[in-house]
């Protein structure tokens, strides 16, 4: 029954996408993030549904290109493009093409749909629709995981959608840190109190899910995001009290197993997992020295001659456990500079442009979404200190939302006041 339902939904998306590529883009967002067919264990489990959606969407984008409404030029998009071209260069000169090419191909697919988002979703309706799809696809796990954590007293770990880049417990904590700010921002689109309460409840359950993952990176992400929010907010006293009360509630609710695991952050010398990460970070720096400018290409650390040279007798060949060291070893210092520049520029631009829009009644929704999106990026940055997800699609979708929201706000601010008033009266 589940197989039939999912397959029927895919058929509907494909048919609608052939007329409107925007529908195909939303379908891709839903399926690539949530992977609902992996929740079924029937014949649809192995069906290449993402390829089907991608094919229909690309065909429609070519046929219906007149529907494109390109986002305005912004440095974020340019740096994002340059970084992608940099990954192409590092792949071309990769130390192991067989290792690098499959991962480069996955990243290319993500970037292709980011480009389609910037081409076809530059309107209020489609921006809001895309963010709702993103929030639903990630938030589903947050609500389900939060309820499970409460029922089990936090004694079991939460895992994400099967077959996705955020399927393990660390990935779930990262996804929740990125979606919680957007959940809060969506309250501006809801008038009824009961719906707003639902938003707050969903955000709370997503937060509980982070705790339920028992991810130390998740705790680092919570602390880092909380610090950024505290710095940005004007209500520092009330937010400070809320943070303290939340911390006390967490300590009271979570079991000793969770507390013991989190305490190993301070005693990394005695913790095998934490000390291993330091060895892997050192290995990343050593790899970067092999090709410091353009890097060694995707998955270079698994190139056995490198492992034999630097790690034999020291540690096994593990993941790098850091976004930034991952980018360093694979894309070099040049790639890391572009990556950090992109991250900082996105946060600064989101905060700056949001302030222009948040006091405009017709743009408050966009300003609020843009303002909170910077905390999604902050959550990614802090949690990314401990996990290697430098190319995860969720992050690039957030960057696309930032560019689209900035574009929409700047377009509306450039219009004469009378025109904005007329559009508001017409409900546009």
Where are these regions (language model features)?
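Transmembrane helix-loop junctions in multipass membrane proteins, especially transporters and channels
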Residues: 41, 66-69, 95-99, 122, ...
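Juxtamembrane membrane-interface segments at transmembrane alpha-helix termini
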Residues: 37-46, 90-93, 114-121, 141-150, ...
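Transmembrane alpha-helices of multi-pass inner-membrane enzymes
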Residues: 56-59, 240, 244-245, 342-345, ...
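Hydrophobic transmembrane alpha-helices and their immediate junctions
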Residues: 226, 231, 331-376, 401-402, ...
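Membrane-interface micro-motifs in multi-pass membrane enzymes
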Residues: 1-3, 44-52, 103-106, 165-178, ...
């Amino acid at each position: 029954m589940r197989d039939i339902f999912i397959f029927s939904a895919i058929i509907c998306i494909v048919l609608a996408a052939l007329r409107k590529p925007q529908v195909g883009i939303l379908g891709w967002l839903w399926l690539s993030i949530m992977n609902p067919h992996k929740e079924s264990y029937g014949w649809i489990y192995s069906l290449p549904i993402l390829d089907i959606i991608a094919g229909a969407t690309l065909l429609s984008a070519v046929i219906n290109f007149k529907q494109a409404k390109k986002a305005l030029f912004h440095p974020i998009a340019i740096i994002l493009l340059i970084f992608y071209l940099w990954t192409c260069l590092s792949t071309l000169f990769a130390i192991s093409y067989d290792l690098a090419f499959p991962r480069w191909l996955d990243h290319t697919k993500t970037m292709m749909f980011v480009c389609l988002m910037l081409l076809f979703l530059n309107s209020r309706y489609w921006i809001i629709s895309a963010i709702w799809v993103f929030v639903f696809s990630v938030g589903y796990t947050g609500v389900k995981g939060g309820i499970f954590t409460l029922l089990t007293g936090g004694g079991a770990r939460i895992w994400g959608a099967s077959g996705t880049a955020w399927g393990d417990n660390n990935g779930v904590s990262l996804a929740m840190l990125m979606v919680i700010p957007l959940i809060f921002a969506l309250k501006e689109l809801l008038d009824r109190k009961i719906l707003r309460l639902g938003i707050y409840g969903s955000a709370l359950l997503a937060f509980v899910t982070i705790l339920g993952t028992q991810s130390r990176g998740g705790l680092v992400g919570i602390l880092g995001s909380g610090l950024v929010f505290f710095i940005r907010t004007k209500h520092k006293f009330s937010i400070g009290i809320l943070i303290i009360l939340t911390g006390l509630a967490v300590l009271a609710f979570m079991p000793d197993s969770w507390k013991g695991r989190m305490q190993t952050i301070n005693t990394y010398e005695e913790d095998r997992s934490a000390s291993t990460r330091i060895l892997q970070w050192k290995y990343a720096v050593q790899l970067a020295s092999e090709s410091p400018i353009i890097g060694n290409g995707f998955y270079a650390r698994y190139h056995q001659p490198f492992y034999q040279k630097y790690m034999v007798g020291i540690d096994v060949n593990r993941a790098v456990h850091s976004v930034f060291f991952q980018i360093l070893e694979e894309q070099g210092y040049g790639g890391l500079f572009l990556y950090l520049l992109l991250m900082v520029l996105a946060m600064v631009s989101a905060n700056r442009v949001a302030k222009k829009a948040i006091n405009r009644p017709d743009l408050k929704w966009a300003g609020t979404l843009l303002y909170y999106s910077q905390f999604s990026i902050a959550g990614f940055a802090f949690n990314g200190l401990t996990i290697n997800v430098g190319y995860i699609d969720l992050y690039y979708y957030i960057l696309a939302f930032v560019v689209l929201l900035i574009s929409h706000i700047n377009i509306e601010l450039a219009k004469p006041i009378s025109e904005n008033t007329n559009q508001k009266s017409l409900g546009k």
